[in-house]
From Swiss-Prot:
The keyword ATP-binding belongs to this UniProt entry's keyword annotation: no
PANTHER family (alphabetical): DNA REPAIR PROTEIN RADC, UPF0758 PROTEIN YEES-RELATED
Gene3D superfamilies: Cytidine Deaminase, domain 2
Keyword Metal-binding: yes
SUPFAM superfamilies, alphabetized: RuvA domain 2-like
MPN domain mapped to chain residues: 103-225
Keyword entries, A-Z: Hydrolase, Metal-binding, Metalloprotease, Protease, Zinc
Protein name: UPF0758 protein SPJ_1027
An example Gene Ontology biological process: proteolysis
Domain of life (superkingdom): Bacteria
MF terms in GO: metal ion binding; metallopeptidase activity
Residues spanned by motif JAMM motif: 174-187
Species of origin: Streptococcus pneumoniae (strain JJA)
InterPro entries on file: MPN, RadC_JAB, RuvA_2-like, UPF0758, UPF0758_CS, UPF0758_N
């Protein structure tokens, strides 16, 4: 009798990622996926944990040289190179996002960006942008697609994502498929309702933009509601 064995230590976290989403995975599981396999003596989970144990924080991983990565048990030259490449790619993505976020802080620049995203939509889309203390956009969430009246009594969903992402302020954006960006009474009501809800939670409503393909309206610029 004989048996064939093979090591697919990172298979379980891969399955969890596919079923539950990447945010459900621990740092150890994410690192195990990147490392893929362990050695005959050490599982990929043990290697991942040893790497994490050598760090005071995840940012230390970016600071490690190729040689320092290779000095860790179970990580050879190829894995060290792959890790560095993945870390650098993540860093560049974050850097690009930060630069983009910093460049759209004015209502005009943000409106132009959102016009490109929502201006040609045939249905109304309500989008919330969540910002940190540096006024950088840390998350963008489509709250709903359809009629704005649907959300009038339910600012809770908007605030749910603000709390989830620890945002200190937010910006609402929705489109008018008709092309006219003048706010309706309903738009005014939604703005007041969300602002009041934000104030109760200590969150600042920075603006509410209405966009079309070629124009925009800013509550902060044009009204005293914000």
């Amino acid at each position: 009798m004989y048996s064939i064995s093979f090591q697919e230590d990172s298979l379980l976290p891969r399955e969890r990622l596919a079923k539950e989403g990447v945010e459900a995975l621990s740092n150890q599981e994410l690192l195990a996926i990147l490392l893929r396999t362990g050695t005959r003596q050490v599982s990929v989970f043990e290697i991942a944990q040893k790497v994490l144990n050598n760090l005071s924080s995840l940012t230390d991983l970016k600071k490690m040289t190729l040689q320092e990565l290779q000095s860790l048990s179970g990580i050879g030259r190829v894995k060290a190179i792959e890790l560095q490449a993945m870390i650098e790619l993540g860093h560049r993505i974050h850097k690009h996002e930060t630069l983009e976020m910093e460049s759209i802080l004015s209502s005009q620049k943000l409106a132009k960006k959102m016009q490109q995203e929502l201006g040609d939509k045939k249905q109304e889309h309500l989008v919330a942008l969540y910002l940190n203390t540096q006024n950088q956009i840390i998350h963008q969430q489509t709250i709903f697609i359809g009629s704005v009246t649907r959300s009038i009594a339910e600012p809770r969903e908007i605030l749910h994502y603000a709390i989830k992402h620890m945002a200190t302020s937010l910006i609402l954006v929705h489109n008018h498929p008709s092309g006219a960006v003048a706010p309706s009474q309903n738009d005014d009501h939604v703005t007041k309702l969300v602002k009041e809800a934000c104030e109760l939670m200590g969150i600042v409503l920075l603006d509410h933009l209405i966009v079309s393909h070629s124009n925009y309206f800013s509550y902060r610029e044009k009204t005293d509601l914000i």
